[in-house]
Amino acid sequence: TYKEFNNHISFQYKGFSLALWDTYNFSTGATYNNKEFFNYKAHSTGRFLDAILNYYCEERFPLLISWSTIVFGRDRNKENTANKYSTFCYLEYPIYTKSRWHADAGIGGAFALNKAGSKTNFYGNTNGIVHVLLKVTFDWTLAKHTMPIHACMVWNPQADRAFFQLGIQLFNL
């Protein structure tokens, strides 16, 4: 079973957002350090920090364009001497919107900015499509507070894997 804990902070201005995600995977059987939550040493941490820049186009053509680069953590070369700066580029478009229900489809590809001696990146064994998404969201309202709940399927054609995810946004400051 895959398990992770995410902290993030984001800033938004008009159609742009800038975010920093701190992702810590504590899945059983991981091949990296997943037993020291507060370890932030580049050579031995089980986490990674992801810097993300998004642009949401205007409402007439509501396309989300995203660029995400892992700037720290377990995105290292084989010798563990350099960060690979794996980068994920993504497009997402709403395919259905009605009242409190939304459905979105997306596609993303990955590559490493620093090859560091190999063709691999954090998301796959080579450059290419690593993310195909279909997501359904319901805007649940409780005491005048909206908390979006989503369910999504994600496919990684390069790795021949599929994932199911459930999530809720408890608050938005």
What are these regions (language model features)?
Residues 71, 104-107, 165:
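Intrinsically disordered, low-complexity segments enriched in small/polar residues
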Residues 134-136, 160-173:
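Outer-membrane beta-barrel "beta-signal"
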Residues 102-141, 148-152:
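Outer membrane beta-barrel transmembrane domains
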Residues 1-92, 112-127, 159, 167:
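Outer-membrane pore/translocation modules
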Residues 12-15, 19, 56-63, 93-105, ...:
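Short loop/turn motifs that connect adjacent beta-strands in outer-membrane beta-barrel proteins
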Residues 153-158:
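Short, exposed beta-strand-loop hairpins at the edges of beta-sheets
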